Amino acid sequence: MSVSLSRLERQLGYTFKDQELMILALTHRSFAGRNNERLEFLGDAILNFVAGEALFERFPQAREGQLSRLRARLVKGETLALLARGFDLGEYLRLGSGELKSGGFRRESILADALEALIGAIYLDAGMEAARERVLAWLTTEFDSLTLVDTNKDPKTRLQEFLQSRACDLPRYEVVDIQGEPHCRTFFVECEINLLNEKSRGQGVSRRIAEQVAAAAALIALGVENGHE
């Protein structure tokens, strides 16, 4: 094992029994051969479960939608990339030459994906308890800063934060119709996001309100919120 990987293990607070799992977790799809995408898929599921379980225990009075919003804040790409930078994770990534030249080792989505892959690798290496312990340790500061006040955000903000947590493109809003007299108009808006096959719709007495209604409909369609808040 190289000295550099030993240093990373110290930063992560975990020593791998199977070094190949660690190396695979650090291998981007631009690199020849096997890559970390499957481990990322597994790590994402574990991260969401561990964060959800911890929030369920920490906020016993919170409603389902509030818990979902708190979790989205915890697991969003921005948060994961910040953690990854704290581990200097970019220095250890295996990237293809093109990705390396374009600065992929600094890219938020690549760093966040690699951290999720490491969570998946730890799970395969030592089981759920080891993965849970690392996730909770890494997110201690973020957990301690959360309050239910964080859930009092408008639907557009909540939708944007959810999409950012999944490293997805931001929603696109379009006014498709305006009806009524100038002093009493109704705006009709469509919200398009890549995760949904159909556009979400909203209407209101202003464009802003119609966009908020469309964003709320998108959150329900995604299964993030149930509409009974």
Curated annotation (Swiss-Prot):
Binding-site residues for Mg(2+), renumbered to this chain: E40, D113, E116
Catalytic center residues: D44, E116
Keywords: Cytoplasm, Endonuclease, Hydrolase, Magnesium, Metal-binding, mRNA processing, Nuclease, RNA-binding, rRNA processing, rRNA-binding, tRNA processing
Residue ranges of every copy of the RNase III domain listed in the record: 5-127
Keyword Magnesium: yes
EC number: 3.1.26.3
Annotated localization: Cytoplasm
Top enzyme category: hydrolase
Family membership: Belongs to the ribonuclease III family.
Protein name: Ribonuclease 3
Protein source organism: Pseudomonas syringae pv. tomato (strain ATCC BAA-871 / DC3000)
